[in-house]
Amino acid sequence: MKWWKLSGQILLLFCFAWTGEWIAKQAHLPIPGSIIGIFLLLISLKFNLVKKEWIQDGADFLLKELILFFIPSAVAVIRYKDTLSQYGIDLILIIMISTLCVTLVTGLLTELLLKRKGSVQ
């Protein structure tokens, strides 16, 4: 019975993802459908259209098995080793610079929001 419950919960999560993909495609949005699906799930949870218990076990299972979702990326790295050998240093620099930018902007925004929140109190 547990597998049926788990399968149903995962199916419900995928329904949100598929709905988000459909909305993104139909509306020609530049936002990934999976992000729209997560937002739809958030709204559904916030307004109690979907209860946390309905998806908890399925979400926990997917998080535990998250490493399986990275296997295709690892295979792609191996498959395109010629491209990586040609542009590898450039890609590493781009990844490092973009990570640094994201970290700095996140830190600055966090400080700004904390200062603003502190001044309100």
UniProtKB/Swiss-Prot annotation:
Increases the activity of extracellular murein hydrolases possibly by mediating their export via hole formation. Inhibited by the antiholin-like proteins LrgAB. In an unstressed cell, the LrgAB products probably inhibit the function of the CidA protein. When a cell is stressed by the addition of antibiotics or by other factors in the environment, CidA possibly oligomerizes within the bacterial cell membrane, creating lesions that disrupt the proton motive force, which in turn results in loss of cell viability. The chain crosses the membrane at residues 7-24, 28-50, 62-79, 92-114. Its main location: membrane. It is found in: Cell membrane. GO terms for biological process: cytolysis; killing of cells of another organism; programmed cell death. Disulfide bonds: none annotated. It comes from Bacillus anthracis. The lineage of its organism: Bacteria, Bacillati, Bacillota, Bacilli, Bacillales. GO terms for cellular component: plasma membrane. Belongs to the CidA/LrgA family. CidA subfamily. This is Holin-like protein CidA 1. It is a multi-pass membrane protein. PANTHER family: HOLIN-LIKE PROTEIN CIDA, HOLIN-LIKE PROTEIN CIDA-RELATED. It holds the Pfam family LrgA. Keywords: Cell membrane, Cytolysis, Membrane, Transmembrane, Transmembrane helix.
